[in-house]
Amino acid sequence: MELEVVKYDWDNLIPGLQNNEIDAVIAGMTATDDRKMSVDFTDPYYTSQEVVIVRKDSPLTSITDIQDLKGKTVKGQLNTLYDTIIDQIEGVNHGTAMDNYPSLVNDLLNNGCDAITAELPVAEGIVASNPDLTYVTFKEGHGFKADTSVSIAVKKGNTELLDKIQKALSSISEDERQQIMLEAVKRQPAVNK
């Protein structure tokens, strides 16, 4: 088996599996009940943390609770957990979701919103390539409430590939997985405006 990495728009990942255009999705996808109806998933290989990305010159850099975003405009990536969790903020102005993080970052840098939601590895990559941005984590019990575990998706019924991937994942310790994710963040392409 040979590995070939291809870039797909988020909304085309599951259709790509179903149409045999791609064999597996390794893209920070959570195995939701809805998705499980369309594709099969490995056990989770990583659990992330939800954060918000803000401009460094914003007073939001010091918040510790998602409710501190009340009255602010917050945006997330279209058709992802990171858009739906915004509704956990009481009184938030839930901005229109965007297709990708470069668009969200551009919007944030140009004052189109006050914050964008992301998982920690994505936020680290964005902040590393955008010196005017930072990310905010929340105090224990004061962040978003959502399943942030991610799994690998394969075409529904492709048990042979699913079993091979699961066996490979099972051979990697939790510490090794965390280290692999840290290295992946360092290698990801810059997300600039």
Regions found by a protein language model. Give the residues of each.
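Extracytoplasmic small-molecule ligand-binding "clamshell" domains
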Residues: 1-28, 37
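Short helix-initiation/N-cap motifs at beta->coil->alpha
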Residues: 4-15, 61, 96-110, 121
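A ligand-binding cleft/hinge motif common to bilobed small-molecule-binding domains
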Residues: 12, 28-38, 85-88, 109-110, ...
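Hydrophobic residues within well-ordered alpha-helices
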Residues: 17-18, 69, 108-109, 165
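Short, Asp-centered acidic motifs that coordinate Mg2+ and/or phosphate
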Residues: 23-24, 114-115, 151
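Periplasmic-binding protein-like
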Residues: 47-54, 120, 124, 128-169, ...
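Flexible hinge/capping segments at coil-to-helix
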Residues: 55-73
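Ligand-binding clefts/hinges and TM-proximal coupling segments of bilobed small-molecule sensing domains
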Residues: 81-98, 134-140, 166-193
